[in-house]
Amino acid sequence: MTTLARPTAPLRADCIADTAGGLTFDVTVDGRGGTAHLVLRRRDGHEEVFLPLTPAADGRLRAALPSSVGLPEGCWDAYARVDGGERRLMPGVMDLTAADGRVPYETRHGNLSLRCGR
């Protein structure tokens, strides 16, 4: 008898833009042991930015992308790397009222990406 693997629930990240031009990502993950990072990978290049995911007050993991971290213009795909495994992030709630030049968005495949430019 063959047993099917239980499908893994998608990881979602809520995004909040601040008035200084930074973004905060809140990610809900299962089994929060070990090292965790939010990875931004430039779609048309080989550049990656690693942001530490740290425990937040609500039990989720939080990463901050301050305005001082320069990202070249383009589209950046968002991933969560937890305990050595990497998974594509899907968008959750997005409060982009203060967004300026860095805009998280849902791709046509339902994934979370970040568009940078002026």
Predicted features, each with a name:
Residues 1-118:
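Basic, ligand-binding patches in group-transfer machinery
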